[in-house]
A protein has these predicted regions:
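Beta-strand-loop-alpha-helix segment that lines the small-molecule cofactor/substrate pocket
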Residues: 60, 64-65, 71-72, 76-123, ...
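Predominantly a Rossmann-like dinucleotide-binding segment in NAD(P)-dependent oxidoreductases
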Residues: 122-221
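Contiguous beta-strand/loop segments that form the cofactor/metal-binding neighborhood of enzyme cores
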Residues: 184, 189-282, 333-345, 363-365
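Short acidic low-complexity segments
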Residues: 49-61
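N-terminal Rossmann-like dinucleotide-binding module
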Residues: 1-46
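Short, Asp-centered acidic motifs that coordinate Mg2+ and/or phosphate
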Residues: 30, 64-65, 145
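C-terminal helix-rich "cap/oligomerization" subdomain common to oxidoreductases
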Residues: 65-67, 114, 313-379
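Charged, glycine/proline-rich intrinsically disordered loops and linkers
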Residues: 158-170, 280-322
């Protein structure tokens, strides 16, 4: 049994509480948040302990892992404070707001013999496991190209001010617009790409603020880029394009093209997403052939797009009984559980150390639109 403490009781914290039930090896020691009213609301809803102060949380002798769910600007300071207190850290993305901050966190953990892991946990999902199995089995031959989409749709045109978490937290829209969709969400694509294809050797990054007016309350804010695209070359030879945005229609799919076929993961925010396989040496499914014939005869594209290939049946049972509600069908607590399990076995967690640093560095480069770059981090 590994005892954890959560710092930050905002919107995302309810996702962690929902999925904590999947992991009997984790015990929640308590929660702290600087907003006393929000802390009372959160702990009362979930029936859990509230720490009286951050110091009390850090000094809890039972706590092995501090889970950092604060806003991104606070990640660096809190990560360092937890490490100085002798705690392992599981941090929401990114580890810091600059490469130097993220690097300092990883170096500090190494010097103190501690471990830092980074979210998100969808890179540990059943869908990623199935996709990796298909690639390793040679079902599409050698993978050459990947397209990862992380488009959230025009969120700022939605009724986002009314969105609430299970325990009543408001969705922090204004702050999300200030931080930007890339730092918030690029990790959901990057975690898959890095897990499947290894470290990035070089890349091209572009970002822009395409909608400077995001409605009431935003006019006095310094808004971050709401669109970014990164073209990444991996040391394994794979080329990938990752797009993040807050305006184009929602699309969180991943397409991988190999010498002999394609894999399409319909939704990276769904741990059991349908995964489609198409082999170039086999006919497409009947419905896809009929759709193609109809389009040729009519000379016009259909008003809907079918996912290429046949859905692949999962050869193993679901690893989580409870997932967060759509559209975030992710076992958020799985990353913490995987970290605890590895530490208890004396192993290195997958998304820790230099790999976690690499993911933060890539997200920061995409968000900043740095142009040509070569990552400093390696693993």
């Amino acid at each position: 049994m590994t005892t954890i403490a959560i710092v930050g009781a905002g919107f995302v914290a309810d996702y962690y509480m929902t999925t904590l039930a999947n992991h009997s090896g984790l015990r929640l020691g308590g929660v702290w948040d600087h907003d006393a009213a929000r802390l009372r609301q959160f702990t009362a809803f979930h029936g859990i302990k509230a720490y009286g102060s951050l110091e009390q949380c850090m000094e809890d002798p039972d706590v092995a892992i501090v889970v950092n769910l604060t806003n991104p600007e606070s990640h660096f300071a809190l990560n360092c404070a937890a490490l100085e207190a002798g705690k392992h850290v599981y941090c929401e993305k990114p580890l810091g707001m600059s490469y130097d901050e993220a690097r300092h966190v990883i170096d500090l953990a190494r010097d103190k013999g501690l471990t830092v892991c980074g979210a998100p946990a969808n890179g540990l999902s059943d869908a990623k496991r199935l996709t990796a199995q298909l690639i390793e089995a040679g079902r599409i031959g050698k993978p050459r190209l990947a397209y990862a989409e992380m488009e959230d749709g025009p969120v700022f045109k939605d009724n986002w001010t009314e969105w609430r978490s299970r325990s009543g937290a408001k969705w922090p829209g204004l702050h999300e617009f200030e931080v930007g969709c890339t730092l918030e969400h690029a990790g959901y694509g990057l975690s898959w790409l890095v897990a499947l294809f290894g470290p990035v050797e070089r890349g091209q990054a572009f970002s822009a603020l395409t909608f400077p007016d995001k409605g009431p309350g935003t006019h006095s804010l310094s808004l971050a880029a709401d669109f970014s695209v990164g073209c990444l070359t991996f040391q394994s030879g794979v080329t990938a394009r990752l797009t993040c945005g807050l305006a184009a229609p929602r699309d969180r799919s991943l397409t991988i093209v190999g010498d002999e076929g394609t894999i399409v993961v319909r939704d990276l925010w769904d741990d059991r997403s349908p995964v489609h396989l198409r082999r170039f040496d086999r006919k497409p499914p009947l419905l896809q052939r009929l759709a193609s014939r109809f389009e040729r005869q009519r000379g016009r594209a259909l008003p809907l797009r079918l996912t290429l290939g046949k859905p692949v049946a999962y050869p193993f049972p679901a690893s989580a009984e409870t997932l967060s509600s759509f559209p975030s069908r992710i076992d958020f607590a799985r990353g913490i559980a995987a970290m605890a399990d590895a530490l208890n076995k004396g192993e290195t967690p997958f998304f820790s150390g230099l790999r976690a640093l690499h993911l933060s560095e890539l997200a920061l480069a995409l968000n900043d639109g740095v142009g040509s770059f070569e990552p400093q981090s390696r693993f």
